[in-house]
Amino acid sequence: MGFCAALNMDLWSAMSSSINVSPNHSRLIRIAAALLIGPDGRTLLVRKRGTTAFMQPGGKIEPHELPVHALARELEEELGLDIDPAQAVYLGHFSAPAANEPGFVVHAELFQLNIDSDVTPAAEIEEVIWIDPATEGGVVLAPLTRDLILPFYRASLTAIA
């Protein structure tokens, strides 16, 4: 039983919700992100070319695109990972300062996927690492990952233990 089984959400409603980015909100970056969990419980993080911070894989949601479909597209482009969107479990909406765009805020729709396949960095991804969620892996982490997603994952593991 995955840690998300306790979350009883209206998945369709969550996946189809959107944030209106008007000219007054032009400093917002709307993304879909993945908490990719391997068989050993570690989570996959990526680092974009020319940056220092590791973060969840994913990317920007195109206009009129469902977050889960954006996630599937980005995982295929960045990691060669072909996922079934129906297998992605919606975890919620998380916001934090953007790691690579000073002055911007990232609004992330986060999904969990359990994977047991190899990934290959592609597109703008320079490096991938698997880290134990109990640690920070000894690397620089994006604010969203460090302050929200990893603590959320740790708390969920404690809740089901």
What name fits each language-model region?
Residues 16-43, 60:
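Conserved N-terminal beta-strand and adjoining loop/helix that marks the start
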Residues 38, 42-78, 82:
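Conserved Nudix-box catalytic region and its N-terminal flanking loop in Nudix hydrolases
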Residues 110-112, 120-154:
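NUDIX/MutT-family hydrolases
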Residues 94-120, 151-152:
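Active-site-adjacent beta-strand/loop module that shapes the phosphate/pyrophosphate-binding cleft
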Residues 82-92:
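A short coil-to-beta-strand element that immediately follows conserved catalytic motifs
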